[in-house]
From Swiss-Prot:
Identification of the protein by name: Small ribosomal subunit protein uS4
Superkingdom assignment: Bacteria
Similarity section: Belongs to the universal ribosomal protein uS4 family.
SMART domains: Ribosomal_S4 (SM01390), S4 (SM00363)
Keyword annotations of the record: Ribonucleoprotein, Ribosomal protein, RNA-binding, rRNA-binding
Subunit structure of this chain's protein: Part of the 30S ribosomal subunit. Contacts protein S5. The interaction surface between S4 and S5 is involved in control of translational fidelity.
GO cellular component terms, semicolon-separated: small ribosomal subunit
All residue ranges annotated as the S4 RNA-binding domain in the record: 98-155
GO molecular function: rRNA binding; structural constituent of ribosome
PROSITE patterns listed in its UniProt record: RIBOSOMAL_S4, S4
GO biological process, one term: translation
Keyword Protein transport attached: no
Length: 206
């Protein structure tokens, strides 16, 4: 499956909620979802009742779009989660949350996960003192994440927006030195991603 290259705002309208894919634009009046909060297309306003399969598929698509993960990789996360200990759905979300690009976003160094992904890909992030340019790199408790270029305009914009926002309890942030630490894996109640993970589990288990 190729990476989606169309307008991000169409994805928000398709899912019927803001996915916060465009940074500051999502918080402004310019957000297309504010003006057209219905599915894209000529007949976007029509409400169709989804089948059980449709509901599960929709939930999977929503999670993939929020985290910016393609189908092949998303399925691999599910397979890992289903083989591990604990609740499969919660474990799936933990794998997604501990991706390096997501942690960079959660630490407030990027306005969106896509922007965080670019920071990682361009070599602006180090893990335990070593530069890492793989957005999907999964962090574990005790790992230290460091921002190597503090003066980038996108980083400064993110800090101005999220500067006073508390980071999730499973992360620790040293704002002065631009370092973060993974304290532990996140609990389900600490993950604010608007998805029903059980529907995703049911989709892949059918």
């Amino acid at each position: 499956m190729a990476r989606y290259t169309g307008p991000d705002c169409r994805l928000c309208r398709r899912e019927g909620m803001k996915l916060f894919l465009k940074g500051t634009k999502c918080f402004s009046e310019k957000c297309p979802f504010e003006r057209r909060p219905f599915a894209p297309g000529q007949h976007g306003r029509a409400q169709r009742k989804l089948t059980e399969y449709g509901l599960r598929l929709r939930e999977k698509q929503r999670a993939k779009r929020i985290y910016g993960v393609l189908e092949r990789q998303f399925r691999r996360y599910f397979e890992i989660a289903s083989k591990g200990r604990g609740v499969t759905g919660e474990r799936l979300l933990q794998l997604l949350e501990t991706r390096l690009d997501n942690v960079v976003y959660r630490l407030g160094w990027a306005l969106s996960r896509d922007q965080a992904r670019q920071l990682v890909s361009h070599g602006k992030i180090a893990v335990n003192g070593k530069r890492v340019n793989i957005p999907s790199y999964n962090l574990k408790p005790g790992d230290v994440v460091e921002l190597l270029d503090k003066d980038l305009i996108p980083v400064q914009e993110a800090i101005s927006v999220f500067g006073n926002k508390n980071v999730p309890a499973w992360l620790e942030l040293d704002r002065e030195n631009f370092r973060g630490r993974v304290l532990r894996l996140p609990k389900r109640e600490e993950i604010d991603t608007p998805v029903q993970e059980q529907l995703i589990v049911e989709f892949y288990s059918r």
